[in-house]
């Protein structure tokens, strides 16, 4: 819907004084999408490519391949011309690398880790294709002294738990003034303790399990690193939450 609305007023051609600026389809777009928001990211990329008049080859994460298969079935039933949408499942270092290196692919759009982004950029360089990247980040959530400390901290911590914390925009690094530190810790602790983890099909659960074992082990490892480096653990820990 957002893409259709944008197309209603989007100018593919502009007259600028004595010249014309025309935006044309770039060609074949290789798409590499993540496991944490699989359908969201695929639909965003696919809708944009169709709107621009591009064909595409999409590689979903090997951890969440079924969303790609479901989307392919939907697109097939919708009647999109054959060859416009192409789905290839597989591992990033194999299929992702093949897409990045292929001279038949004019552009790569990747949403994923910084490590994956670097690999894609390097593999794409020899063919001088365009590369669009949305990678991991850790921008600070800065709470100023004149903010509503309770609302700001509670909201910030709650956002960290969205999608079981598996979100690139999760504001997991919060900065507050020394004067508000103790209050912020108290609020954060309260929000964390009220956030229940368990079966995602249980309406009382606010968080389900981590997507895969490797990611779970990484989260546990990062918690332990924080403790080892002197951080104070105020909620949760390295043990598997009750109910999971």
PLM regions and their residue ranges:
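Long amphipathic alpha-helix in the N-terminal Rossmann-like dinucleotide-binding domain
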Residues: 1-6
């Amino acid at each position: 819907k957002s893409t259709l609305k944008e197309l209603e007023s989007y100018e593919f051609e502009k007259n600028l004084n004595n010249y014309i600026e025309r935006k044309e389809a770039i060609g074949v777009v290789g798409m590499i999408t993540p496991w944490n928001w699989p359908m969201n990211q695929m639909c965003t990329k696919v809708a944009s490519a169709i709107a621009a008049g591009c064909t595409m080859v999409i590689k979903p994460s090997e951890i969440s391949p079924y969303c790609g298969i479901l989307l392919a079935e939907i697109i097939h039933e919708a009647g999109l011309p054959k060859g416009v949408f192409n789905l290839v499942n597989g591992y990033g270092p194999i299929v992702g690398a093949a897409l990045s290196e292929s001279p038949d692919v004019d552009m790569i759009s990747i949403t994923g880790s910084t490590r994956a982004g670097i690999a894609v950029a390097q593999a794409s360089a020899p063919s001088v294709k365009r590369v669009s990247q949305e990678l991991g980040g850790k921008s600070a959530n800065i709470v100023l002294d004149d903010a509503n400390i309770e609302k700001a901290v509670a909201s910030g911590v709650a956002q960290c738990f969205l999608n079981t914390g598996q979100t690139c925009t999760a504001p997991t690094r919060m900065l507050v003034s020394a004067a508000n530190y103790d209050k912020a810790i108290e609020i954060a602790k309260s929000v964390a303790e009220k956030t229940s983890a368990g079966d995602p099909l249980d309406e009382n659960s606010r968080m389900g399990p981590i997507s895969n074992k490797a990611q779970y082990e990484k989260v546990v490892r990062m918690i332990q690193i924080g403790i080892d480096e002197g951080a104070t653990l105020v909620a949760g820990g390295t043990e598997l939450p009750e109910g999971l």
